Amino acid sequence: MPLLISPFAELDLIRQPEQQDEPLQAFDAADEYLLNHVAETGLSLQSRVLVLNDSFGALAASLASHATVVSSTDSFLAAQGLEKNLARNGMSYDAVPHIPASEPLSGPFDWVLIRVPKTLALLEEQLIRLQGQLAPGARVVAAAMVKHLPRSAGDLLEEYVGPVQASLAVKKARLLFATPQPMEVRTSPYPTRYRLDEPAIELLNHANVFCRDGLDIGTRAFLPYLPKNLGTARVADLGCGNGVLAIASALDNPQAHYTLVDESFMAVQSAAENWRATLGERVVEVRAADGLDTQEPDSLDVVLCNPPFHQQQVVGDFLAWRMFLQARAALVNGGALYIVGNRHLGYHTKLSRLFRGVEQVAATPKFVILKARK
């Protein structure tokens, strides 16, 4: 893989999760453009720099030796990537503190460097949280590849920071410069809430939760076919989002024990709050993690999963395949993985390579619900 070469450092970077023969690099031209701009403008060792949505630490690791840098993302994998890439390039793994996007920031910051996220609600929430966190004369610069830069990103910067000027495109990347202005303090529109009829629950969703304004159609197809009569089974909701699958299952299985896992800190925050609102003090484990990567082998009886098919702007089934492998390792012999997936993704064939038996539980014109037994 090529090195990220900037005026600040030459770095050998890896993506997360790691894959053999990884076809994609851990940085892009928008990272390079942003680093070059910071170097041309000038950065002092005393500067406090906040980096938002740095996918694998390309920006934060480049600047770590040149200023006081703090990174904030909504991704456990991004936080893990930052640590690994710092260590991989001869720095302490904790040289740059990482603050989950679900937690408050602590300024003042002289620079705010933003990689525009796929979910603009996350950007909006991050900009709202910047209120009162900027030092006098602070510089706020957002970067993206042109094909992933909607006009509304600039509109949000203008609404919450100040006037915006766009750069020329360089290597198909563009920068947005926002000049901070005094603003009326704004209240966040997040979290959002919606109600379900079956089960009759209300769900809260922080800004970066998938389908935060209503139940996604895959989950809606899955809910009627969640397993019942689980007794004291140990159940994991893998990629839990707002926790709806686990909560619905727990209502039907009052003695079962649940673990909810997602790589999004805001998803985990939403799931924990929804569990408490619906199930009170019933014991549960909710954690941000790389799926079931750290789950003890043979420690689960059932895994529920509505697998994602994209990581930011990268689309593919590599995350689903990884989840299936993790589920197989964590399940006891005879345990079962239940999933919902689009018909065209061919999950039945993939699961048949990993599990002893795969059966179709139900189907709709668009989705299939599958049960794979270890």
Swiss-Prot record:
Cellular-component GO terms for this entry: cytoplasm
Keywords carried by this UniProt record: Cytoplasm, Methyltransferase, rRNA processing, S-adenosyl-L-methionine, Transferase
EC assignment: 2.1.1.174
Molecular function terms from GO: 23S rRNA (guanine(1835)-N(2))-methyltransferase activity; nucleic acid binding
SUPFAM superfamilies xrefs: S-adenosyl-L-methionine-dependent methyltransferases
Top-level taxon of the source organism: Bacteria
Compartments it resides in: Cytoplasm
Protein's name in the database: Ribosomal RNA large subunit methyltransferase G
